[in-house]
Amino acid sequence: MKRNLEVLISALGKDPFELASHMNLECDAVIVNQSNTDRSYDFRTTNGVNVRVHESSDRGVGRSRNAALDKADSKIVLFSDDDIVYRKGYADSILKAFAADPKADVILFNVDVTENRRTYHIDKTTYVHQGSVGRYPAYAAACRLENIRRAGIRFSLLFGGGAKYSNGEDSLFFMDCLRAGLTVKAVPVTIGKEEPRKSTWFNGYNEKFFKDRGVLFHFLYGKYAYIWAVRFVLVKKRKFKYSMKISKAFKLMKAGIKEGQELASKMEGRK
């Protein structure tokens, strides 16, 4: 198998043997499966893929991704979830993209999703900046492992499935990469698809959604969080106009930003 690439899969209550087969893995993988036990074991698929499984009773997608990062031992890692199915040749496509640009630390790829879940589509090669990190999911990203470790970048335990606040751990990861001076690139190469399923965190544009988004925006944008909050409610207003007034949505985001400021201050005080 391609030892230069490893898929880091965050799973929840899955059968690792069935999962590895269903995902069409072409390279080695680490599966962190959140279950009711704590154990580790390895197996090899029928097409020769080496899979290292780590069952864990811990909860939270951030914990899962960090655990997978700790276990990884290849030059390049690809983040993944248990609802991703890869195209034939995806591994070669990823390795070729990194070979073509030795300066790229993180490369984002297309993963097809249903229209109502689409937040991005890469139609030309571009470099990701701080204003666009919120578009991309973690499962779109492959990274040079050594560079990520050298920069000390980890996934937040505050955001995402199983955490106190809703999604955002992937956006923070990419933002931390940029803040560390790493190069994040997006290429128009499709490597797989996401199978439809109910979201683990999105329950509509309710009060929690907007307040959590405010907390996230503080950690993403700092003193510019309020500006980004205004932009967010204006861009999204058509999606929630029948369930909440724009003024209330913005008020909730402001409350979230304030909560984020207080939380960041407490975290800084513990250092």
Spans of model-derived segments:
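N-proximal low-complexity "stem/linker" segments adjacent to membrane-targeting elements
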Residues: 1-30
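Glycine-rich, basic loop-to-helix element that forms the pyrophosphate-binding segment
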Residues: 55-72
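Conserved nucleotide-sugar donor-binding
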Residues: 73-74, 137-157
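Short aromatic/hydrophobic "clamp" motif used to bind/position activated sugar donors
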Residues: 77
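Conserved donor NDP-sugar-binding/catalytic core segment of glycosyltransferases
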Residues: 85-121
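Catalytic beta-strand/loop signature of glycosyltransferases that borders the donor
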Residues: 155-157, 181-193, 205-206
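Acidic donor-binding loop at a coil-to-helix junction in glycosyltransferase catalytic cores
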Residues: 160-172
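Non-catalytic, C-terminal membrane-associated alpha-helical segments of glycosyltransferases
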Residues: 204-271
